[in-house]
């Protein structure tokens, strides 16, 4: 069945203003790395996450995840996730945060493994295999039933081919959340829709073409 999945990057109080009936997953964004550990940046973020999780009392079907990274938020990911020891340490810390906050899982938003993302952030070809093992370790240390997903850069050249080992990763995750936006922006030479459903006159990239690209790689819609 289709799911409604939303990201939340607001403050502690604003979440109370939203009607969350019908939302399946709410992903709190963003947590970051502190050394090789998943970390909450400050007390304000901790209070916000607590209140987001508290929404489950009002909406019993709601699942709350935390998200690692975001645009510019994964500066050390390539280095940290380059060793098995650090990947295991991250997985253990993630399981601890999920349990202590009574959350339901994690969404990985590393932009991007193996290809250029945020300017100046390190990337290397080995990121692709390291991402796979990161997912393996998370599955190993998270408890059964915890949700594991990742955000995929549909608008990034080479992402589908160079960032993810789809055949190995997809059996281990619950969802892949396609970032089907930023197809046009301030650096574009022509105007176009920021988040196109279908391909346009000047660019093939769109929600439809991104989903088709995943299916061509063997990723099943369900």
Label the predicted regions.
Residues 18, 97-101, 169, 214:
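Generic structural signal for hydrophobic
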Residues 90, 94-116, 121-122, 126-130:
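Serine-hydrolase-like catalytic core of hydrolytic proteins
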Residues 8, 30, 66-70, 110-112, ...:
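A cross-domain feature marking catalytic cores of carbohydrate-active enzymes
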Residues 70-71, 106, 193:
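Gly/Ser/Thr-rich helix-start
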Residues 26, 66, 108, 138, ...:
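Conserved, mostly hydrophobic/aromatic
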Residues 1-98:
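Glycan-recognition patch characteristic of GH18 chitinases/ENGases
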Residues 2, 60-64, 102-106, 144-146, ...:
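Short, well-ordered coil/turn segments that N-cap beta-strands
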Residues 35-47, 113-222:
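Substrate-binding surface in catalytic domains of secreted glycosidases
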């Amino acid at each position: 069945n289709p799911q409604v999945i939303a990201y939340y990057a607001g403050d502690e109080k604003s979440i109370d203003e939203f009607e969350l009936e019908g939302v399946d997953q709410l992903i709190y964004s963003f947590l970051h790395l502190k050394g090789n550990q998943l970390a909450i940046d400050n007390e304000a973020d901790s209070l916000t996450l607590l209140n987001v999780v508290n929404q489950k009392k009002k909406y019993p079907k709601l699942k709350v995840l935390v998200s690692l990274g975001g645009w510019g938020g994964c500066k050390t990911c390539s280095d940290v996730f380059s060793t098995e020891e650090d990947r295991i340490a991250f997985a253990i810390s993630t399981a601890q945060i999920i349990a202590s906050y009574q959350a339901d899982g994690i969404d990985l938003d590393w932009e991007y493994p193996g290809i250029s993302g945020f300017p100046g952030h390190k990337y290397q070809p080995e990121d692709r295999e390291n991402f796979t093992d990161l997912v393996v370790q998370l599955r190993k240390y998270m408890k059964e039933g915890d949700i594991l997903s990742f955000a995929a850069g549909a608008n990034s050249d080479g992402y589908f081919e160079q960032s993810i080992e789809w055949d190995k990763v997809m059996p281990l995750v619950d969802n892949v959340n396609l970032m089907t936006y930023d197809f046009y922006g301030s650096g574009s030479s022509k105007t176009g829709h920021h988040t196109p459903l279908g391909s346009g006159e000047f660019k093939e990239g769109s929600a439809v073409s991104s989903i088709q690209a995943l299916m061509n790689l063997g990723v099943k819609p369900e």
